[in-house]
Amino acid sequence: LWSLGNELQHHADMPFNDWGVTLYRLMRQLLHRYDHTRLTTVAMHPRYRNIDTDSLPADLAVATEVNSYNYRYMYFPGDMKRYPEKIFYQSEASTEAMGPNFFEMNLDKVMGLAYWGAVDYLGESLGWPLKGWNKGVFDMTMLPKPDAYFVKSMFSEEPLVHIAIIEKAGTDTQWNGINVATQRLSENWNRNQGEQLSLYTYTNADEVELLLNGRSLGVKKNDADPKLRNRIRWDAVPYEPGTLVAVARKAGKVVARHQLTTTGEAVALKLKPETTDWHADGKDLMMVRVTAVDRKGRRVLSAHDLLHIEVKGEADIVAVGNGDMASSELPVGDKQLAS
């Protein structure tokens, strides 16, 4: 599939004055000189009769070979009746509405979706001190955030369960016409004694049992409701040092586990290169993951020390980053806070 534009139908000031249809057709004709094997589309943010339920299809919806809508997956059922011969695609899906925007689609008629933006990026900040978009499920170093496992639970048949602690619920912010929540998640089990926590367990299994230092805190079923499916919420979970374990079961059998553990203080740094096959030829680029660990080699998520980085030999530091959009260190420097 080739996409030939984004929201072209919003641009009435084009010279053809037809909301992007002629431009799309010209681009498709040019594309077919090089590749006529793939279908073409344009990502649209459709007009509507009712913003929540019913679109008012733009001319581009008729012209394109695949109907691609940004965010408005709730329009698919009505437009499938209008255009029974069409294939649909959710070209931008919000990372703040994950779950419904996947489970509520008719996957026999919808190709799938692309999350915007699934990976954090510089630009489009929601306000200082953020330097860019931080609502992805992967940070800029490509480290998965807890809700990346929620996405995996939708697309993978591999049984899984993953604990995500809600650090900050916050309030919704309007951005580009959609609600963007300020909820922040973590896997940190170094906390204050007696603290009451809310958390999610992401799973594609039938049920999850939560255990704190071996004591069961209860069993909760996975909900079939698309707004709740694969995301089980727990409230008033008491903190105490030790281990918090989520056990997922399917048809009564244990199929997956995830454990959070209280760690000791950070005493060392662990370096892991992405590959050992690289050459000092001025062309190779290597990413090295630096992790703060305790005496048992466990990652210490509560460590926020300032790290100074030095390279010896035939290599130079190109950039450093900790994945935190609010961090004030420059990516072109040689120091960075652990995050």
Listing of model-derived features with the role each one plays in the protein:
Residues W2, H10-P15, G20-R47, A58-E65, ...:
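Substrate-binding clefts and catalytic carboxylate motifs of secreted carbohydrate-active enzymes
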Residues G282-V288:
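Short, solvent-exposed loop/turn segments enriched in Ser/Thr/Gly
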Residues A205-E209, G242-L244, V288, A303-L307, ...:
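Short beta-strand/loop motifs in extracellular/secreted proteins, especially
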Residues A224-R233, S327-S339:
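Aromatic sugar-binding surface patches on proteins
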Residues V288-A292, G297:
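Short, well-ordered beta-strand segments enriched in hydrophobic/aromatic residues
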Residues L1-L4, P331:
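Aromatic- and acidic-residue-enriched carbohydrate-binding clefts of CAZyme catalytic domains
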Residues L30, L39, P46, G321-L337:
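Acidic/polar low-complexity surface segments
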Residues K220-N222, V267-L271, I309-S328:
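Short aromatic-acidic-glycine turn motif
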